[in-house]
Amino acid sequence: MALGLEDKKAIVAEVNEAAKGALSAVVADSRGVTVANMTGLRKAAREAGVYIRVVRNTLVKRAVAGTDFECLSDTFTGPTLIAFSTEHPGAAARLLKDFAKAQEKFEIKAAAFEGELIPAENIDRLAKLPTYEEALAQFMMTLKEASAGKFVRTLAALRDQKEAA
């Protein structure tokens, strides 16, 4: 189906708006994936706060121009699925990485975070970023372990002092 100029402008504006509000982006090739599986991916994306769109390459190049995701322009070849993380930088990478494990024909091309291009083989860097809650829990565990260690050392010093006296 041919798109009119107004439709193309609307798509570019929509994707550009998503890119401006996104924390990271992932580009993938979805050739060979069934409609049912793509529908499942879209549903999971909505739940994870990820914007997914299959867009023509010329339109997506225009949409990301002037954003942090302009570095992805060289990856826009063949059918392009672009996913923007809106709530957590690693959400789209984690979602598409898990989907690619289940779908052998689904291929992640690259990702971008803070204007830096991340090749597909390094997608784990982005996918393994802890969420805010996970990072906070890790920090609290570190504080808890440090204070417990200090308490144990204080008790040991007190014991040593009493034994010496």
Curated annotation (Swiss-Prot):
Q: Which InterPro entries match?
A: Ribosomal_uL10 (IPR001790), Ribosomal_uL10-like_sf (IPR043141), Ribosomal_uL10_bac (IPR022973), Ribosomal_uL10_bac_type (IPR047865), Ribosomal_uL10_CS_bac (IPR002363)
GO cellular component terms? large ribosomal subunit
Keyword rRNA-binding present in the record's keywords: the answer is: yes
SUPFAM superfamilies per UniProt: Ribosomal protein L10-like
Q: Which GO terms describe its molecular function?
A: large ribosomal subunit rRNA binding; structural constituent of ribosome
Q: Which PROSITE patterns did the record assign?
A: RIBOSOMAL_L10
Give the UniProt record's GO annotations in the biological process aspect. Answer: translation
Q: How does it assemble?
A: Part of the ribosomal stalk of the 50S ribosomal subunit. The N-terminus interacts with L11 and the large rRNA to form the base of the stalk. The C-terminus forms an elongated spine to which L12 dimers bind in a sequential fashion forming a multimeric L10(L12)X complex.
Member of which family? Belongs to the universal ribosomal protein uL10 family.
Name of the featured protein: Large ribosomal subunit protein uL10
Question: Gene encoding this chain?
Answer: rplJ
